[in-house]
Amino acid sequence: MNRVLYPGTFDPITKGHGDLVERASRLFDQVVIAVAASPKKNPLFPLEQRVELAREVTKHLPNVEVVGFSTLLAHFAKEQNANVFLRGLRAVSDFEYEFQLANMNRQLAPDVESLFLTPSERYSFISSTLVREIAALGGDITKFVHPAVAQALTERFKR
C-alpha cells in the first residue's frame, strides 16, 4: 500500500494545497496531510485549528486523513508508515529549497521517497503568506481558500 505524507505548516490551507491533495488522493491509496506545529514560524493559527481547517477542506476525500505533528518529519513518517513524501512546486524558486529538503530527508529516512507535484495553473500563484497578507488588509480571499478558511481568517483579522 502506498501511503503518502504531505507535510506543511498550512497556515492556512489554500485552494492550491487542496488541489494537490485531491490529485494525490487519486494517485495513492492513503494521503496523510501532516500539519507541522512549526513554532519558529510563529503561525497565525494554532496547530489544532490548522488541523481542523485542513479536515474541513478535505472531508469529501475518504482516503485522506489530517494529523498534526511536532517531531522530526523523518520520525513522523516512520510512525505513520509512510513510504512517500509529497511536496508541491509552484515555481522554479521553490525547487532549490525543496531539493535540499528532499536530500536531507533521504539521509534521515532512506526508505521514504520524495515526489514533487506542480500545482494546477489556476492555483500556481497562491501562497499561504499572500493569503494572510490580503486577509490582514481586508481584501477578498474567497478565490484562494475554502469558505471555512475564509471565515477563520476574517474572524482572526476583525478590527
UniProtKB/Swiss-Prot annotation:
Gene: coaD
NCBIfam families xrefs: coaD_prev_kdtB, cyt_tran_rel
Protein known as: Phosphopantetheine adenylyltransferase
Location in or out of the cell: Cytoplasm
GO molecular function: ATP binding; pantetheine-phosphate adenylyltransferase activity
The protein's role, per its UniProt record: Reversibly transfers an adenylyl group from ATP to 4'-phosphopantetheine, yielding dephospho-CoA (dPCoA) and pyrophosphate.
Pathway assignment: Cofactor biosynthesis; coenzyme A biosynthesis; CoA from (R)-pantothenate: step 4/5
Organism: Pseudomonas syringae pv. syringae (strain B728a)
CDD domains per record: PPAT
HAMAP family named among the record's database cross-references: PPAT_bact
Binding site for ATP: 9-10, 17, 88-90, 98, 123-129
